[in-house]
Regions:
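Bacterial N-terminal signal peptides
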Residues: 11-20
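Sec-dependent signal peptide cleavage junction
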Residues: 21-37
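Short, surface-exposed binding/anchoring microloops in extracellular/periplasmic proteins
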Residues: 37-77
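Solvent-exposed serine/threonine-rich low-complexity stretches and specific carbohydrate-binding patches
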Residues: 84-100
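Surface-exposed, short loops/turns at beta-strand junctions within beta-sandwich domains
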Residues: 102, 109-117
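Hydrophobic/tyrosine-rich beta-strand signature of extracellular beta-sandwich/beta-rich modules
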Residues: 120-122
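Short beta-strand elements
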Residues: 128-145
């Protein structure tokens, strides 16, 4: 019994030390980040102020590589456990923006008069000569009181 307890203690100590080394290596190189073929960065913000919801979207690609971006965005409201689209007058309640340049930004606004939890759902599809299309999904929640 003493031998198995000692063995278990040593095994746990080795596992913990190895996992700590792996985490140290990741933090030493500045963390882990994804690499995209045609897209450098995106920025999405969503706020509601004075009964107006505002979704701000921007992206930056790579000069000489990025050729086109399609950005789809919508606002959804949470009811109990489910999310439902807020009517913005567009097909499928989705704003669709096309860009034929390396970077772009757009802001959409919508009247929101009911209090509750809302979110902006944004999908960036960025095309270019760097490889397969980059598809980035971002969700930003906001509680309107």
């Amino acid at each position: 019994m003493k031998l198995s307890r000692k063995f278990l203690f040593v095994a746990v100590a080795v596992i913990l030390s190895v996992s700590t080394l792996a985490m140290t290596a990741v933090y030493a190189i500045g963390g882990v980040s994804t690499c995209n073929n045609n897209l450098n960065m995106t920025a999405t913000s969503f706020v509601i102020f004075d009964d107006v919801g505002e979704v701000s979207i921007s992206f930056v690609g790579y000069t000489g590589i990025t050729t086109e971006a399609i950005v789809e965005s919508k606002i959804q409201k949470k009811t109990l456990f489910w999310w439902s689209d807020v009517d913005n007058g567009e097909t499928d309640n989705t704003w669709v923006d096309h860009f034929y340049k390396v970077s772009g930004d757009v802001t959409h606004t919508l009247e929101i008069t009911k209090k509750g939890t809302y979110r902006a759902v944004v999908t960036y599809t960025v095309k270019g000569t760097g490889g397969a299309d980059d598809v980035i999904d971002e969700v930003v929640e906001f509680v309107y009181k």
